[in-house]
Amino acid sequence: MAFGKQTYDGSGKEMRESLLSILKDVSPNEDNYFVSNLGVGSAATQKTHEWNLYFADRATSVDPEIEGAETSYPDLTVETRSSNSTVILDAPVKLSRTRASIAMVSGEDAMGVEKERALKALKSEMEYATVNGSYAAGSSGVARQMAGIDYCITTNVTAWGSARSFTETDLNDIIQTSWDKVGASYVIDVIAAPVVIKRRVAGFGTNLTRNVQAEDKKLTQEVRVYDSEVGQTVKVIAHKDVLKTAGTLTVLGLREDHFEHSFLVNTGEPHWEDRAKSGDFEAGVYITEFTLVSYDERASVKTTGWLSGL
């Protein structure tokens, strides 16, 4: 029976496709606590960035002086120098002239969309380097790498021999480890760990709250606050880049203001650079050169070997 035209016959080729003009990007590239929250220190003026540290042990005995004694002068504590290498990270974008001329499904400019994605990818890589960077001085043909937070913490490190369930006592032990090493005003104030640890902390009881000062909550994710037995209040954040594989699952206890980013002077902060055209394309790169400054890692604590499940 003749019916003119239906969608089931060849006339379907005449119809505009039903293509949603909204693209949901669920890439995990926006959970970047440290890039968003760490302070920015003085600019690095060369590839090796250095700073001085001072630490004097607390008195553990009494050394009284007799009447009329001449003053004796002990050796004074000498400052030590710490350093880190700058690392160059980039996120390049290259589109053929034809592709750059054609709009995206959403109607947006193709080059603009790819540049936005590249910037998010760069920020994600900066975050990963901040947490897990492994120091390398570099050489001809070999890239420099900066030491990340995990690499910097060397004084207060505990590796459990077998998978250990994370308890409230363990959390307080971590905070006390920091308290034992440094002045009370420098005790850790952030716990960064895989999400399974945050879930365990959620069941710890009455010392826990979800309330956070608005100026502290720069990310949209929920940040829990724990009032420890030591007296220190710590933020507990779930972090995607802290080691979470079985056997190496890590909990980082950090004094946040003891870590900063320093960017290479003049050109180190993330920025866009057009690249020379050598063909029928448009190209450029988001690029940065920066390092992590660790003012004194002995205030922070690293523990590994936690159970990877609830």
Regions found by a protein language model. Give the residues of each.
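Flexible, glycine/threonine- and acidic-rich loop/arm segments that mediate assembly and lattice contacts
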Residues: 1-310
